[in-house]
Amino acid sequence: MKALHIITGLGVGGAEQQLRLLLKHLPVESDVVTLTNPGAVADGLVTDGVRVTHLGMAGNRDLAALPRLVRLIRSGGYDLVHTHLYRACVYGRLAARIAGVRAIVATEHSLGESQMEGRRLTAGVRGLYLASERLGRATVAVSPTVRERLMRWGVPAPRIEVVPNGIDLDRFRFDPLRRHQTRRRLGLPEDAFVVGAIGRLTAGKRFDVAVRAMARLPRDSWLLIVGGGPEENVLRRTAHEAGVADRILFAGERPYIADGTPGPDLPSLASAMDVLVSPSPEEAFGLAAVEALASGLPVRYVSCPAIEDLPAHSAADVRRVTCDPGAFAGTLAEVRTHPPRPRATPDAARHYCITRSADRLMDVYAGAVAAPLQSPSSPSAQGVSP
């Protein structure tokens, strides 16, 4: 089987890094097209031996990109097209159908209750998504929670397949030597209580809650923020206003897989932490929380379908917290005073092993390739309405 993956961009983000990890485990010849921003993940894919093409799309309404994408698909001789993220799903599914490819799969990585990929949901966004969804054969939800959201939109249940995000368990396994080396490299005191936060620095992630919580914790507590984005300067100002700027470390965007760039990779940073916080009130999956669990960390979160969709006993040291600095400060103070537990990987993290996700996705591919040709139907009025 030969597959083409179409994604909106390849900067450092959860969906982008998930695609790179998946391609390492899929027994499929795969190429990648990025509509925009061939960033660090594009470089990583090329290093992995994947052919990456930058379409050079100027914006959401750059209709001239559509015929370029159609020509690229036709020339590639692909058996299947797999799209990722909103813009790539809308343009990619249409281009694939025009190019004559009928086996089309799309993954919905980032659908919240009121936003998608950090943007507010509108009737127009839903309507366009549903119209393009009919052009494919399967829509992959990264969690049962996302599946329910898609069904409420009007996507028929039989068209939705749940394939959770996956992680490389061995890569995130706790390593005490790596912890010591990473703390020394970052200038973190060896005996400091280090709170971790991982993700895009956008307003919706609510990392400001974690920053303000630090003002209520003892001076030996640090906040290690891993990620980049438009809210970094806002968070720095918030830290200064709260009087904790000297105890907050911005590590920037860090690769999932070591790529030779200066600075530790994401698993090393996880080893350096004592607890992970996720103050985001809307998540489609909660990949950072699962990665933290794989490293044996306690997790305190506001929304995390990856944890909530599993039995309660799957992970012992996880707690749901309200999105409030005082609530986070209180639960972090409890973690700080408890004797440290062995950093073992719980069942919840093992449930999301990347090889398991790759196997499930291959089943979706097989079904999409074998399915009979059907004409796309118009989206229902129910699906288009807010």
What are these regions (language model features)?
Residues 13-21, 193, 197-216, 230-236:
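A conserved mid-protein helix/loop that constitutes part of the nucleotide-sugar donor-binding site
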Residues 5-64, 149, 229-230:
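N-terminal strand-loop element at the rim of the active site
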Residues 281:
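Aromatic "clamp/platform" in nucleotide-sugar-dependent glycosyltransferases that forms part
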Residues 34, 298-302:
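Short hydrophobic beta-strand element within catalytic cores of glycosyltransferases
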Residues 313-326, 334-337:
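Conserved acidic donor-binding segment of nucleotide-sugar-dependent glycosyltransferases
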Residues 145, 166:
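Carbohydrate-associated surface elements
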Residues 73, 253-254, 261-264, 268-273:
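Short alpha-helical donor nucleotide-sugar binding micro-motif in glycosyltransferases
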Residues 236-260:
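Nucleotide-activated donor-binding/catalytic signature segment of Leloir-type glycosyltransferases, i.e.
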